[in-house]
């Protein structure tokens, strides 16, 4: 094993699995300390340096002068869209920003009414609103089509009813981006909401939404078995499976949660995410309770995706009196359905038994977690909350601590899903809450460093959007905020910032924004730009984010660079990589080692289908730039290169008599050995009424504990003036 790998192995020995993250067409390896594959934005963990260095007495830099409750009444309203027939759909959540943003694209799809008067509900009364305005942009080029203020505002049922009138400036059938800006009287920054709109010339979505509402209203009613069987391809067969997952082919007992006494706690608001003349894809999320072991009520968040064929619809009058769910005779027809549910843990239920604890109903193993090197402490995220559990094998008594939660006085839970992300087949990729949490470090003393990002609904930063860096100290059981980074970005934009951040041992936090690496000093709260802008956005981070490689000179496009510069976030030093007159193709990082390819102008193939590069050589270089491994073979060229686990995968090509490239076979370059396992693992096991539930195991041992040992933090300490704006 080369010395270039050893330090990386030491840092990543807690890793149980790894996942691949791709960025702007360039395969990129980012280390996620998770057990399971993390998409978005469900979460993952970044390895970082200590927040504060004890022997340098830097702890004084976050001595605080105030305490603040984590929870409270949310000051970030939501917006619901309404159809032409006043059917509610597409609940929009916002983020703080002083100005409109032309780069944001909405996830939901709204049908404009035939008169282009789009009605919306806002979850605050009109007397709280200073101004309401909107922009419409062409997504193809970002050109502003319209910007106007909304003046038609009234109150109904404790909410604001507003009408957005879109002028006759958009083309029929073309999809546009709409951004709504809400300015509140008691909030300095505005709140932005994004969606997509289209003039559908009277075509509406009411039939499809009523289909979903009818399905949802009956799916947990055991008297409606025949109804659900006709709506899906379900059967009455017994099925020993996971209640948290179901699709259109699952047994009715699984889809309907028979024997679970399931009860919906809120009526869901469906979101349209794709629509054309033949097909509509909708998603929704809502809380459900069921009777668990001992008849105790448990809470689960259900996430669903529906694909509907739009065929045989009858007129509006007939639909009002007749069900739209009868074997596709008319109206929409369900062609795909998927459900993923995730249980929210209750402190009273948390206990360690036989070196493991139960996480209840979970659709998969996508749990963000990290353990200390000794395995005595495990941190994990569940239901928008951050937990730390102690095994009890050391000096500290075993048990659970909830380190962070936005659950507050307004009754809004932190586990509510705000976005159900689906793939092209209508299957659920991941689900995202209104905030994200990223675990940065768990020490052998039980101290935890983590980041919270998104629109802060409560606490000191309520109404603001940004990233907070926090540290929990085991000795005094206190949580302290080190720095707050105010960022006018949506949740996905902030997720990207956090995924690529790095905190070194000197209290310097590195983030990448606008294709540049920037440094935030959390001792004096200054922001400094450390690198030039990456050419053609060609860049990559090492798995622990301590190294940042970026293109500094172009090489005729095609994703090639004449020079790649590597910046070290621990030392502040840079080094350049060149390959003579050849171009460099940045593939990504594997551990702390940089992987890149080499090609010349003759290896760039340009045609009507696009541009493709064929590499003559693949190089793996350590942190000092030394080649630790390379692959090169006379007469062979390599393309379709990506990093997967501990290998570099690629396709081999040769040249024909005409000089064209011809595919030969596929190959892999083994780059390194696997690291050591962590202090925890996840696995499903048989249960009673719930069939299968997820358990987290302590791989290095644990003593039994009970839920009575759980400790819930409800406040954190902060210091005024610790805010940096980017």
Residue ranges and their predicted role:
Residues 163, 168-171, 278-353:
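Exposed beta-sheet edge and beta->alpha loop/turn motif
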Residues 64-134, 179-183, 187-263, 357-416, ...:
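Core segments of small alpha/beta cavity-forming domains
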Residues 273-288, 302, 448-452, 594-599, ...:
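A short hydrophobic beta-strand element
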Residues 139-158, 402-406, 483-488:
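Solvent-exposed serine/threonine-rich low-complexity stretches and specific carbohydrate-binding patches
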Residues 33-50:
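Hydrophobic membrane-insertion alpha-helices, especially the h-region
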Residues 392, 475, 521-525, 568-571, ...:
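Short loop/turn segments that connect beta-strands within beta-propeller blades
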Residues 104-121, 130-138, 143-149, 155, ...:
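Surface-exposed, charged secondary-structure patches
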């Amino acid at each position: 094993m080369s010395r270039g790998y050893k330090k990386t192995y030491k840092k990543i020995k807690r890793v149980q699995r790894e996942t691949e993250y791709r960025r702007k067409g360039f395969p990129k390896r980012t280390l996620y300390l998770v057990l399971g594959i993390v998409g978005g934005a469900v979460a993952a963990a970044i390895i970082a340096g200590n927040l504060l260095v004890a022997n340098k007495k830097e702890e004084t830099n976050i001595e605080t002068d105030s305490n603040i409750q984590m929870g409270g009444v949310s000051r970030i309203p939501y917006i619901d869209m309404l159809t032409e027939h006043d059917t509610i759909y597409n609940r929009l959540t916002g983020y703080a920003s002083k100005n409109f943003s032309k780069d944001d694209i909405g996830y939901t799809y709204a049908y404009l009414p035939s008169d282009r008067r789009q009605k919306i509900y806002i979850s605050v009364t009109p007397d709280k609103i200073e101004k309401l305005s909107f922009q419409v942009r062409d997504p193809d080029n970002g050109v502003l089509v319209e910007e106007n203020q909304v003046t038609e505002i009234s109150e109904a049922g404790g909410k604001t009813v507003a009408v957005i009138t879109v002028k006759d400036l958009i083309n029929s059938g073309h999809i546009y981006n709409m951004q709504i800006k809400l300015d509140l009287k008691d909030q300095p920054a505005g709140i932005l909401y994004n969606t997509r709109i289209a003039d559908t010339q009277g075509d509406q979505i009411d039939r499809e939404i009523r289909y979903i509402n009818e399905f949802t209203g009956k799916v947990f009613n055991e008297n409606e078995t025949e109804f659900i069987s006709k709506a899906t391809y379900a059967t009455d067969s017994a099925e020993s499976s996971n209640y948290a997952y179901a699709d259109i082919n699952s047994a009715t007992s699984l889809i309907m949660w028979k024997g679970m006494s399931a009860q919906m706690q809120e009526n869901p608001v469906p979101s349209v995410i794709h629509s054309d003349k033949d097909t509509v894809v909708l998603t929704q999320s809502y809380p459900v309770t069921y009777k668990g072991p001992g008849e105790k009520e448990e809470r689960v968040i259900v996430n669903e995706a529906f694909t509907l064929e739009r065929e045989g619809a009858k007129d509006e009058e007939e639909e009002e009196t007749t069900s739209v769910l009868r074997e596709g005779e008319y109206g929409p027809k369900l062609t795909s359905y998927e459900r993923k549910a995730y249980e929210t843990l209750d402190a009273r239920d948390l206990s360690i038994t036989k070196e493991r604890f139960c996480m209840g109903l979970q659709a998969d193993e996508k749990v963000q977690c990290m353990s200390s090197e000794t395995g005595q402490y495990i941190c994990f995220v569940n239901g928008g909350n951050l937990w730390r559990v102690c095994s009890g094998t050391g000096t500290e008594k075993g048990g659970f601590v909830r380190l962070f939660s936005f659950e507050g006085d307004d009754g809004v839970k932190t586990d509510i899903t705000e976005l159900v992300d689906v793939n092209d087949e209508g299957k659920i990729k991941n689900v995202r809450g209104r905030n994200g949490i990223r675990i940065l470090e768990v020490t052998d003393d039980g101290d935890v460093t983590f980041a919270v990002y998104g629109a802060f609904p409560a606490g000191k930063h309520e109404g603001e959007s940004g990233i907070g860096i926090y540290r929990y100290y085991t000795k005094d059981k206190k949580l302290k905020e080190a720095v707050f980074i105010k960022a006018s970005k949506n949740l996905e934009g902030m997720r990207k910032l956090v995924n690529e951040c790095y905190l070194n041992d000197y209290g310097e936090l590195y983030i990448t924004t606008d294709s540049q690496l920037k440094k935030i000093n959390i001792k004096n709260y200054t922001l400094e730009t450390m690198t030039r802008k990456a050419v053609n956005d060609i860049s990559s981070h090492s798995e622990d984010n301590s190294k940042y490689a970026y293109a500094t000179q172009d090489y005729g496009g095609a994703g090639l660079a004449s020079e790649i510069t590597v910046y070290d976030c621990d030392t502040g030093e840079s080094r350049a990589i060149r390959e003579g007159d050849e171009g460099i193709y940045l593939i990504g990082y594997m551990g702390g080692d940089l992987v890149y390819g080499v090609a010349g102008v003759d290896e760039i193939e340009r045609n009507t289908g696009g541009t493709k590069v064929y590499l003559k050589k693949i190089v793996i270089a350590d942190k000092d730039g030394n080649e630790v491994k390379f692959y090169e073979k006379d007469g062979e060229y390599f393309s379709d290169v990506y990093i997967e686990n501990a290998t570099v995968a690629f396709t081999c090509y040769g040249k024909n008599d005409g000089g064209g490239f011809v595919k030969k076979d596929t190959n892999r370059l083994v780059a390194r050995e696997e690291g050591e396992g962590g202090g925890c693992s996840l696995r499903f096991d048989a249960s009673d009424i719930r069939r299968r539930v997820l358990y987290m195991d302590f791989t290095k041992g644990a003593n039994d504990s009970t839920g009575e040992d759980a400790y819930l933090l409800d406040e954190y300490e902060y210091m005024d003036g610790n805010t940096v704006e980017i």
